[in-house]
């Protein structure tokens, strides 16, 4: 009973960024299933984790004016000894993901853009809301995968879901793709869709989701089965 299990959050370019103990993670599960995102814990010192407004363009120079308030979803950035300064022989990638910051003493450091979106809660915990490139930009505002999919994943007949956008950013139609659990007959698809539609109607920020498509097997990263190929699913959903 006294054992502790810590789960890190990070990336190849910076690991770890934050950590969370198993019991705390379990205690946040209800919030995750209600659309809060996934709590990944507190930043690992001496890393400095800050949230900036979402911007798809490169950012050459750091400015504190870009930072957003606690509770506001933005892009996660990290500065610290575990963050890389550049990509080897990949200048375009370095330009897109690295920000140069001038400190008060005149020295400089590199800030890494995680490419993930999230926010800090009132307790200083970091919440992961998905990949920046996989957000869905609707006419009524953005939807983030990790604030949507876990809510629908609570349906017992659903194995997993994937939120994708069809159309131009700013006017995208949100589409929820889903896989049925093994053994669930195809004849239940209509019933499942009605249940998913009811879930959407109970959550204000998901009310715009009115398209539900059953997919036989999501495309995934061959290295990480949990990484769903939402870009490929979006092409499929648009057909």
Predicted features and spans:
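Gly/Ser/Thr-rich phosphate-binding loop
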Residues: 1-35, 48
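Active-site glycine-centered loops adjacent to acidic/histidine catalytic or metal-binding residues
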Residues: 10, 41, 116
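Conserved ATP/PPi-binding loop(s) of AMP-dependent carboxylate-activating enzymes
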Residues: 42-46, 54-102, 141-143
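Residue-level recognition of short loop/turn positions
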Residues: 48, 55-56, 64, 103, ...
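Generic structural signal for well-ordered beta-strand positions
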Residues: 59, 68, 121, 127, ...
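Conserved C-terminal "lid"/linker of ANL adenylate-forming enzymes
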Residues: 162-167, 175-176, 197-239
């Amino acid at each position: 009973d006294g054992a502790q299990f810590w789960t890190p959050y990070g990336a190849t370019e910076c690991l770890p960024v934050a950590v969370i103990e198993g019991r705390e993670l379990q205690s946040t599960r209800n919030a995750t299933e209600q659309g809060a995102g996934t709590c990944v814990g507190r930043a690992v010192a001496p890393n400095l984790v800050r949230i900036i407004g979402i911007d798809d363009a490169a950012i050459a120079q750091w400015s504190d004016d870009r930072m957003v308030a606690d509770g506001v979803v933005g892009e996660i950035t990290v500065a610290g000894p575990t963050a890389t300064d550049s990509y080897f022989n990949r200048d375009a990638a370095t330009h897109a993901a690295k920000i140069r910051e001038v400190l008060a003493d005149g020295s400089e450091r590199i800030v890494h853009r995680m490419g993930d979106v999230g926010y800090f809660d009132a307790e200083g915990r970091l919440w992961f809301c998905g990949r920046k490139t996989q957000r869905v930009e609707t006419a009524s505002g953005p939807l983030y995968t990790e604030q949507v999919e876990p809510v629908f994943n609570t349906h017992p007949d659903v194995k997993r879901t994937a939120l994708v956008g069809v159309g131009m950013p700013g006017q995208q139609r949100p589409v929820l793709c889903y896989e049925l659990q093994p053994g669930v007959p195809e004849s239940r698809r209509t019933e499942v869709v009605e249940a998913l539609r009811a879930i959407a109607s109970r959550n204000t920020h998901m009310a715009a989701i009115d398209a539900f498509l059953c997919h036989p097997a999501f495309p995934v990263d061959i290295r990480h089965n949990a990484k769903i190929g939402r870009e490929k699913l979006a092409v499929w959903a648009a057909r």
